[in-house]
């Protein structure tokens, strides 16, 4: 069974085509493994009964899809927003009413699910672009203006910025996915012809300034 829903191949495009690129959306199906649950329990020194609680929470969370909104900024960077959606916010609110341990574990499992989503997104990017993801540059809420500027470039209605500068749904991340040709070293620079007229200040252009 595919772990990716609605994936469309993106053909290599010119700088002009990239600047006019539209926001696309796909859904990733992610799961938290038993090994990851054991690691969470070891890290937090939990006992067997608390491991059962982790397993129960993970099963509840398994029905949560990971939504990804993406748009190429240039041939070497993909602007990406990844979210667990408002249904997860509701679930966290309900589990948070039980006790502090349950609330903490539920929160940790959500971040683990997002982390698993990064790997699935890396696999999806290779299918979509023929390139590999070599790095992720997270855009944090420490700079609300920058956060708003990047999020505005994604045409979508699910994610918004709250007055305090945080994104909603709460389990949402925004980042730039660095792309490189799929070769052994993954260090090949972008062709000069592709980047010559590109206005996006990615690492390739910064190195030449």
Please provide the spans of the model-predicted regions.
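Generic secondary-structure signature for well-ordered alpha-helical cores
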Residues: 63, 126, 130, 200-203, ...
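General structural feature for long, well-ordered alpha-helical segments within catalytic domains
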Residues: 50-57, 117, 121, 125, ...
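Catalytic cores of large soluble enzymes that bind and process phosphate-bearing ligands
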Residues: 46-49, 106-109, 113, 190
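Composition-driven recognition of glycine/serine/threonine/acidic- and proline-rich low-complexity segments
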Residues: 65, 71-98, 147-181
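Short, structured protein-protein interaction patches enriched in aromatics and acidic/basic residues
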Residues: 132-153
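Active-site helix-to-loop segments that bind/position phosphate- or nucleotide-bearing substrates
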Residues: 1-98, 102
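Cysteine-cluster motifs in flexible loop/terminal segments that predominantly coordinate metals
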Residues: 170-209
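Conserved mixed alpha/beta catalytic, RNA-binding, or beta-rich assembly cores of soluble enzyme
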Residues: 76-139
